[in-house]
Amino acid sequence: MIQVANAPCSWGVIENVEGERGGYARVLDEMQEAGYAGTELGDWGFMPTDPRALRRELERRKLKLLASWVTVHLHDPARLPANEADVLRTARQLAEVGGPDNLVVLGNDPYTDPLRTLAAGRILPDHGMSEAQWRTVTDGANRLARTVKRETGLRTVFHHHIGTWVETPEETARFLAMTDPEVLGLCFDTGHYSFGGGNPVEGVRRHADRIWHVHFKDHDPKVAARSRRDGWNAVKSIEQGVFCELGNGDVDF
């Protein structure tokens, strides 16, 4: 039987996004009421950071913990030690509360580069990284994933994402080709892959052996077309609904 989980970001609990946040208890209650099997951790500090307290909250709702996004800055080697500490903090929480099948989701800090934020959904080849930048990003990802595996036994996945340096199908494929398949897989996001110029079904087939985690997200082609026509940036595209409710877009689930 296929089981589906959710994440606090569906309730607006996510970095870079302003607005009212409900408490974690409400989020977990509504996940349980909707019939989800589990949850991602969400931003550090949103849910209890004490493992025993978090375990109690999940168990009384019969929810499983399965993964957590951690924002990293792979393009900036000076920030790698701090990123490593953040990743390990989250990985230890996941391992203790969720168990050995949990996954750390690396997300390269979205919407921080002006060009990549502005050109989301219409990335051109000359918008990409240099050879040296590619090595910096992939070496950093490998280092973090190996540290997580060594210290906690957990595996790590990387989330391709609009408004970052790894958005398009070609960039996603190159990232995977330059990283260690023993410790680092892909968090495949159907909506981001589609808005980034790809066909999600083809993406799943192409990267099946590296996809260890999936984010189901739909994509509204009409909003995407307006974004490209009017030059919206990534944040405005999201605000205007480029990632629509499941079933209302063009992703063939």
Task: Describe each PLM feature range.
Residues M1-P100, W134-T136, N142-R143, R150, ...:
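N-terminal pre-domain/capping segments
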Residues N6, G38-T39, T138-C244:
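Acidic/histidine-rich catalytic cores of soluble enzymes
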Residues S10-G12, D43-G45, T71-L74, N108-T112, ...:
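Active-site-proximal loop/turn and secondary-structure-junction residues that shape catalytic pockets
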Residues E18-G23, Y111-R122, A224-K236:
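Short, flexible, mixed-charge acidic loops at enzyme active sites
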Residues P48, P77, W165-V166, S194-G197, ...:
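Loop/helix-junction capping segments adjacent to catalytic residues or to phosphate/diphosphate-binding pockets
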Residues K64, R79-L186:
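Active-site acidic/histidine proton-transfer and metal-coordination neighborhood
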Residues S68, L106-G107, V214:
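Short glycine/serine/threonine-enriched helix-capping/active-site loop
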Residues C244-D252:
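Short amphipathic alpha-helical interaction segments
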